Amino acid sequence: MKTFVLHIFIFALVAFASASRDSAKKIGSQYDNYETCLTEHGLTDDDIFSIGEVSSGQHKTNHEDTELHKNGCVMQCMLEKDGLMSGADYDEEKMREDYIKETGAQPGDQRIEALNACMQETKDMEDKCDKSLILVACVLAAEVVLADSSEGA
């Protein structure tokens, strides 16, 4: 069973290194709890943002706040079902471990630093849904930047 880290991400997590390159794919759609979380929140695949929209930040300008919140709730649901989040709180160590397992990142890897920065940026947010989507978006955006910088090097 795959775990979701922002899995991103990671989801969201996450969705993270290889998935971020498939921009038409829906965030989180490759993970086991995706369909369950869609059903629990009364959403369909059509309601979920694409990886490309999220990694580019277009989801923030192309969608209403209610759509952003609903997408975040699906992300939070998957993170929680995978033991990476409880309510609005991350299990940071488990999130790092699962992200490393998912991406193959090694200690000192810039992707891990990006995940840490994204968790730090969102850790004090109280709304679990908004927090989850912002975390996933942060990780996906960082992966794009890191991929672009490594291609240019």
From Swiss-Prot:
It comes from the Eukaryota. SUPFAM superfamilies: Insect pheromone/odorant-binding proteins. Keywords: Behavior, Disulfide bond, Pheromone response, Pheromone-binding, Secreted, Signal, Transport. GO terms for cellular component: extracellular space. The keyword Signal applies. Residues 1-19 form the signal peptide. Disulfide bonds join C37-C77, C73-C129, C118-C138. One of its GO terms (molecular function) is pheromone binding. Pfam families: PBP_GOBP (PF01395). Belongs to the PBP/GOBP family. This is Pheromone-binding protein Gp-9. It comes from Solenopsis substituta (Fire ant).
